[in-house]
Structure formats: structure tokens, C-alpha cells
Amino acid sequence: MPGLFAAKKLKSKRQKFKWKDTHYKRRSLRLDVKADPLEGAPQARGIVIEKVGIEAKQPNSAIRKCVRVQLIKNGKQITAFAPGDGAIGFIDEHDEVVVEGIGGPSGRSMGDIPGVRWKVTKVNNVSLQEMVKGKIEKPVR
């Protein structure tokens, strides 16, 4: 049993050992936000640099249509998935797109697309989903 007036010592000791816990340390130093290209934001705008096809992981066999995007706010480059049948046709180089998280576990990639954590939601301020459905035409800039 610790002494009657040992609370301060116990508390400071616990505080010191907290830093050995990886989850506490990453949370306290905000390492996930610092490493995130979107800097903790839910969405970000960017300019399309090029279109890329990424092969799906085993056991699936497909080429997932993605785009390389340079973010406007910090200049970092990310790869974003273009969801929808024929969606890549509505995205051209130098278009302005809005990207958001793809919805994988713990902010990671989803399904069989390796290393892709984001998806395109808007192209030139028009919803990509609406363009794929045929409800809206892509505006000419």
C-alpha cells in the first residue's frame, strides 16, 4: 500500500507511463492529423494531374479508375477513386475536383483498391454522381 499522502507521486508516475501507450501518444501529439494530406478536414479541393488505372487486389481482377490530384491548400498529391460506371469520362486533366474519404476502416483504403484512401465527389462544383446518372451535364469552364 502506498502512503497516505502519496497521491501526487502516484499521479505523476501514471502520467509518465501514459506516454508508453502508443494510442495515447499518437492522440496527444496529433500525429494522425499531421500525417493526413487533408489535414484533418472532411473534404478538400484539388486539381487533377493525371488519370491512373489501379489494379484490384486478389482474388478480384479489374482496373479501378483513379485520378492523381494535387491539393490546393498544401500542394500535396493524393490518389482518388472515381466511383461510378464511366465516371472517369467526366473527369479531365486540370479539372477542379472535391475529394473526401473513401470510407474504409480507420480512415484507410477500402475493399480491393490498394493505397487509395479518397474518392472524387465533385468535378468543377458539380456532383459526379449526378453526372454519372445523366441528370446533369458537365459544365464547360
Swiss-Prot record:
PROSITE patterns: RIBOSOMAL_S12. Keywords: Ribonucleoprotein, Ribosomal protein, RNA-binding, rRNA-binding. One of its GO terms (molecular function) is rRNA binding. InterPro entries: NA-bd_OB-fold, Ribosomal_uS12, Ribosomal_uS12_arc, Ribosomal_uS12_euk/arc. GO terms for biological process: translation. GO terms for cellular component: small ribosomal subunit. Pfam families: Ribosom_S12_S23. Belongs to the universal ribosomal protein uS12 family. Part of the 30S ribosomal subunit. This is Small ribosomal subunit protein uS12. It comes from Methanothermobacter thermautotrophicus (strain ATCC 29096 / DSM 1053 / JCM 10044 / NBRC 100330 / Delta H).
